[in-house]
């Protein structure tokens, strides 16, 4: 069984017809590469603009505001033996790292 990996990003992600898209090719390739060894869950911000790169992983969560984003972070800490990866430090991801530390988790930044 694969370990869970939660990836937190401030990247804008667009959802169209059940598929997810982003403009940053790194945000596309990193989760897809890690998906071979981990059960990846990607967290990002929702945007209505069209994006270029389709993200081909199963578990993607997008949020419209910081409160729903934080509540999902808290919910994710209930998973045992999970790893947490924060891609780039921004106000959103900095707050995520603080919450993870308060809840006894050690994120990889």
Regions found by a protein language model. Give the residues of each.
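Short, contiguous strand/loop micro-motifs
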Residues: 16-18, 60, 83-84
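An aromatic- and histidine-rich active-site surface loop
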Residues: 84-105, 109
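N-terminal subdomain of nucleotide-sugar transferases
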Residues: 1-49
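Amphipathic coiled-coil/heptad-repeat helices and related helical stalk/stem segments
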Residues: 26-27, 69, 92-93
